[in-house]
Amino acid sequence: MFKNEVAEFIYKRTYSRWMEDEGRREEWPETIERFIDFLILKNGEKIPEKTVKKIRQYMLDFAVMPSMRFLWSAGPAAEKDNTVIYNCSFAKLNCVEAFAECLHILMCGTGFGFSVEEDEVSKLPSIPEIKSGKDIARVTIDDSREGWADSVKTLMTSLYEGQNLYFD
């Protein structure tokens, strides 16, 4: 099925999901079905059955491939957060939320390009002198992609407000 052993190894290592109930990894046709099932789940009637059949056959024949990140993540991971299906993204770093979004996107495995052009960065507020002493607040970080991204937003917001935080 695969052109060589290296291609099969890469498929098994990277794209073939473990099937707990069967105690084994997916085979290529099962990976394709997982991908197709996810497409149908998200698009329903928008994709004609004739087109679905063509996609399935072309993938079985290695004539066409989706984004490999999409193939890798189709199913529960992409249902939880579709950011994981993308290869790359871009944002202008002109607000606190952009920094948190950057971390979240990177933690999903998606590349992140950004602009730090002066006309964009100048939209960020100035960082005042940090207050010291009793103004320190303790912040606990939820150990998840969302938790870490939120912590960046909390940190940057506190800096712009002149607060000093302690991250636990």
Q: Where do the PLM segments sit?
A:
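Extended catalytic cores of very large enzyme megasubunits
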Residues: 1-168
